[in-house]
From Swiss-Prot:
This is Zinc finger and BTB domain-containing protein 4. Residues 608-625, 997-1013 have a biased composition (Basic and acidic residues). Residues 629-654 have a biased composition (Acidic residues). Transcriptional repressor with bimodal DNA-binding specificity. Represses transcription in a methyl-CpG-dependent manner. Binds with a higher affinity to methylated CpG dinucleotides in the consensus sequence 5'-CGCG-3' but can also bind to the non-methylated consensus sequence 5'-CTGCNA-3' also known as the consensus kaiso binding site (KBS). Can also bind specifically to a single methyl-CpG pair and can bind hemimethylated DNA but with a lower affinity compared to methylated DNA. Plays a role in postnatal myogenesis, may be involved in the regulation of satellite cells self-renewal.
């Protein structure tokens, strides 16, 4: 009878192992998670159980009837080995190939696994206490790839000894002699054909000898592969080149296979090897990538006197070596930063932080101008461009001569990165539902031979229908649960979450303060009352509301990536609400008014380009809008009115909307936008935003909720308090908006200045006492009162002011006021000396008495020859012109009247005592720009500029008053009292020349006043 035909595939076992390794790297079909140190390693239970007796016993401890391990024979049974390895291999072409594939991974255990898999699933999370993550990463790579790159090319004795000790504890025979001076892992001498000869005997038909494990691994330990860079994410099995993206690795593998098929056609014996040979045979003879042969992992370059450290993998350059070492974690196998919400592990902490934001929904990027928070930096940049007219990219970089951009050295960030509120501590404690006896004694076993002799661990004292899950807990006050599988139970009495199922689940319990779910992603919280935590601003998560159904129905229905056979549950969205209050927050609004009380910004300093430096102190109460009462709001408005004009405009924007959350806005912006006050006024119900501009979300939310609360401004008292608050400093008239007040002030000044569209007028008012420049006359008036308060004992400079109904007032009884914007000259002495002053003023007019005659009523002559002054003139500047006697009466011509020093202009030759202000029939046009035009001392006799057209014509049709000359002067009375600042008596000016071309009316007026001839 002819022997049965047999078909063998020598490359099947390496191909299956390579596919399993690729699945592990991608996280596919992994049914167990190993925790070593602070790192999570996903793996396959079948591969671990077939490679290590420790993992086999640890994974079988939760079975209902664990079979005692056999005490082992010399050679394993191919039938049982095939049954045990069927779970780890994807498919087998024949029984012999399955036998060879399984025997290569389980012969070192010296005992076959049980013939049938356990009835129930073992725990999915297994922690290895005391096992370093770096050494376990190397051992796990060896289990899956049959290759081990020794750290430092084998020269790092401490790392090699650590790997050897871990191999002895796990029962991996090939790693037991590592680090003890054995010759099993001494790197062989470089020989070109050293790896092809073991291949001829490794894949021959028939049962394999007991020492075949060492032979199979020896062919993988070529000198070139041993010196390759360790811990590459996705290495090519042919040439050892590493890749980060799996698609690039697949493209590279296709090219390597075509090259390996031509090189691997020779060197194979007649023992059944295929023409192409196994996929991994000739790969060991290929040289690895240049730069990774046991040398340094970086290249040092000197560019322009600066030392740069270049990564050998991706050729990125770094200024410091520590930055390069930190970057090298990206290319390594070590993923030290596992995600706290899923099974992903990241090489850098910032990668994990950016990833976890999508789980928690935290808004960490805060705009420093409006305190709005955003999830990503890109949303923040878009917001600042649209609402503030600022491009952060232009501030962080500058143009280069070739048209590009380079980063600035002193870049100021226009945002604040808030700390993570969902941050968890690293793994701290571990508790398992089953007794920990199977883990601890087995892990400390000195040799794998003693394991079969040890009795199997007993089952739990009171086993449940399903095995209890393993729980990883964190020491935080309130929990949020991550559920994988059917049923779970939170640790520490924090609550339970059950989904109903027969299999046990592993629960990772994070006891951090929970966050309310996002409204558009999660259903609203259940109506049942929940216990309030200690912090009043912290809301209660559905997982902590003392109910198993609450945690499942609220969060499991909205898991991020639901997969078949499990549900992923977590809480998201950070807590909102600064203002406190124990009620649960609504998920609708997440404005700055609902942030969880971050540390207040004591001072913000922003440099926007080269334009300005803005400094603003923000107290704790500024971050809590809507908490001030009506009286406090009034007090704050009064304080704002006393500030300078620069801060006054800003405060008007803050307080114009009443109780609205109008936070601080910058003074400067690049775009000439229309101001909020100019667009909609400062009415209570107005939005105060430019047209076409969408209001921010916090303002929309307040407007939507305005119907619920009746504002205080709706009452008559509140309406009167908010409507009339802008007062004119000239006529004491009140206005509802600042815009109307400014238009009214322009009417005072004649409306001569017109501002450009979209910009403020360039009018400025300078204080004569200091260098202060104010924007309005009202602000300058308030500023002048401060100077008066600073000099209580000084001699105030009197300003001529009259009372309208004072017919019998003596000229000496003048009202003395504090100096305003300009010290207009005064002739009055102290009260009581009015007669002497009036007699001196009757002789001639001095510069200190610019009194002009004219009016509807004649000046009343009192006893002593003094005259009664006309009604009060509220303006600090006297307007000069020819006066008229009512009824055609003419006053006596005393001495020569005021004479002009201009272009031959001559004022009317009336007596100095008859020169007075214009009375009521002539409305005076007083403009703020007139003050800025008089920066001179009035005691000086130099020519003074005169504002033209300052007097309007009479409304009764009497003719216009004489046109004021461009320059004028006064006759000097040498007996007049000197002014407050004493100056030498000025000389007398010659009489002015009558103006030419003044017209017939001017001549008639001079004739009536006795100035002819």
């Amino acid at each position: 009878m002819p022997p049965p035909a047999e078909v063998t595939d020598p490359s099947h076992a390496p191909a299956v192992l390579r596919q399993l390794n690729e699945q592990r790297l991608r996280g596919l079909f992994c049914d167990v998670t190993l925790i070593a140190g602070d790192t999570k390693f996903p793996a396959h239970r079948s591969v671990l159980a077939a490679s290590s007796p420790f993992f086999r016993e640890a994974l079988l401890t939760s079975a209902p009837l664990p079979l005692p391990p056999a005490t082992g024979g010399a050679a394993p049974n191919p039938a049982t080995t095939t049954a045990a390895s069927s779970s780890s291999s994807s498919s087998s072409s024949s029984s012999s190939s399955s036998s060879s594939a399984s025997s290569s991974s389980s012969s070192s255990s010296s005992s076959p696994p049980p013939a049938s898999p356990p009835a129930s699933s073992p725990p999915r999370v297994l922690e290895l206490p005391g096992v370093p993550a770096a050494a376990f990463s190397d051992v796990l790579n060896f289990i899956y790839s049959a290759r081990l790159a020794l750290p430092g090319g084998g020269g790092d004795g401490a790392a090699v000894a650590e790997i050897g000790a871990l191999g002895r504890r796990l029962g991996i025979s090939r790693l037991q002699g590592l680090g003890e001076g054995g010759d099993a892992w001494v790197p062989p001498t470089p020989a070109p054909m050293a790896t092809s000869q073991p291949e001829e005997d490794s894949f021959g038909p028939g049962p394999r000898p007991a020492g075949e494990w060492e032979g199979d691994r020896a062919e993988a330990q070529a000198p070139d592969l041993q010196c390759s860079l360790p811990r590459r994410p996705l290495p090519c099995p042919q040439c050892g080149k590493s890749f980060i993206h799996p698609k690039r690795l697949q493209t590279h593998e296709a090219q390597c296979r075509r090259g390996a098929s031509t090189r691997g056609s020779t060197g194979l014996g007649a023992g059944g090897a295929g023409p192409g040979g196994p996929a991994g045979v000739d790969a060991s003879a290929l040289p690895p990538p240049v730069g990774f042969r046991g040398g340094p992992e970086h290249v040092v370059k000197v560019v322009g006197g600066h030392v740069l450290y270049v990564c050998a993998a991706c050729e990125r350059s770094y200024v410091t070596l520590s930055s390069l070492k930190r970057h090298s974690n990206v290319h390594s196998w070590r993923r030290k930063y596992p995600c706290r919400y899923c099974e992903k592990v990241f090489a850098l902490a910032e990668y994990r932080t950016k990833h976890e934001v999508w789980h928690t929904g935290e808004r960490r990027y805060q705009c420093i101008f409006c305190w709005e928070t955003f999830v990503t930096y890109y949303n923040l940049k878009t917001h600042q461009r649209a609402f503030h007219g600022i491009s952060p990219g232009l501030l962080a970089s500058e143009k280069t001569p070739n048209g590009g951009y380079k980063p600035k050295l002193n870049t100021l960030k226009l945002y604040r990165l808030l700390p993570m509120r969902a941050a968890k501590r690293p793994y701290k404690t571990y508790s398992q539902g089953a007794p920990e006896a199977p883990l601890s004694p087995t892990l400390n076993t000195p040799a794998p031979v003693a394991m079969p002799a040890s009795p199997p661990p007993g089952p739990p004292p009171a086993p449940e229908p399903g095995p209890p899950p393993s729980v990883i807990t964190f020491a935080h006050p309130a929990p949020s649960v991550i559920v994988h599988g059917g049923s779970s139970s939170g640790g520490g009495g924090s609550g339970t979450a059950s989904t109903g199922g027969s299999q046990a689940a592993s629960v990772i319990t994070y006891t951090a303060p929970p966050r309310p779910p996002k409204k558009r992603e999660y259903p609203p919280p259940p109506p049942e009352p929940a216990a309030t935590p200690t912090s009043p601003a912290t809301a209660v998560s559905p997982a902590t509301a003392a109910g198993p159904a609450m945690a499942t129905t609220t969060e499991e229905a909205k898991g991020r990536n639901p997969r078949a056979g499990r549900t992923l549950t977590y809480t998201a969205k950070p807590v909102g609400g600064i203002g406190g209050g124990g009620g649960p927050p609504t998920g609708a609004g997440r404005g700055p008014s609902q942030l969880q009380a971050p540390p207040p910004l004591c001072q913000i300093t922003v440099r926007i380009g080269e334009e300005a430096i803005v400094k603003r102190r923000i107290s704790e109460t500024d971050l809590r809008p809507g908490e001030l009462s009506g009286e406090e709001m009034e007090e704050s408005e009064e304080d704002e009115e006393e500030e300078d004009e620069e801060e006054e405009e800003e405060d008007e924007e803050e307080s114009k909307a009443g109780g609205e959350d109008q936070l601080w806005r910058p003074y400067y912006s690049y775009k000439p936008k229309r101001k909020a006050g100019a667009a909609g006024g400062a009415s209570v119900g107005g939005s105060g935003l430019p047209r076409g501009r969408r209001p921010p979300r916090w303002r929309q939310k307040l407007e939507r909720r305005s119907w619920e609360e009746t504002p205080a401004a709706e009452s008559p008292a509140g309406r009167a308090r908010t409507e009339r608050r802008h007062r004119c400093g000239d006529c004491a008239q009140t206005f509802t908006t600042l815009r109307k007040l400014r238009k009214h002030q322009e009417a005072h000044g004649g409306g001569s200045h017109s501002s450009r569209a979209g910009r403020r007028p360039s009018t400025r008012f300078t204080c004569p006492h200091c260098a202060k420049v104010c924007k309005t006359a009202a602000a300058l008036s308030r500023h002048g009162q401060r100077h008066a308060a600073e000099r209580p004992g000084g001699t105030p400079t009197p300003v001529i002011a009259y009372s309208k109904g004072s017919a019998g007032t003596r000229p000496g009884d003048v009202k003395e006021e504090a100096p305003q914007e300009m010290q207009v000259s005064s002739s009055s002495g102290e009260a009581g000396g009015g007669s002497t002053a009036a007699e001196e003023a009757s002789e001639t007019a001095s510069l200190q008495d610019p009194i002009i005659s004219g009016g509807e009523e004649p000046p009343v002559v009192a006893s002593g020859g003094s005259y009664v002054y006309p009604p009060v003139q509220e303006f600090p500047l006297a307007l000069i012109g020819g006066g008229r006697e009512p009824g055609g009466g003419r006053g006596k011509s005393g001495s020569e009247g005021p004479v002009g020093a201009g272009e031959g202009d001559r004022m009317e030759g009336i007596g100095a005592a008859k020169v007075t202000f214009y009375p009521e029939p002539y409305p005076l046009v007083y403009g703020p720009q007139l003050l800025a035009a008089y920066p001179y001392n009035f005691s000086n006799l130099a020519a003074l500029p005169v504002a033209l057209n300052m007097v309007l014509p009479d409304e009764k049709g009497a003719g216009a008053l004489p046109f004021l000359p461009g320059v004028f002067g006064y006759a000097v009375n040498p007996q007049a009292a000197p002014p407050a600042p004493p100056t030498p008596p000025p000389p007398t000016l010659p009489p002015p020349i009558p103006p030419k071309g003044e017209g017939e009316r001017a001549g008639v007026e001079r004739t009536q006043k006795g100035d002819v001839g």
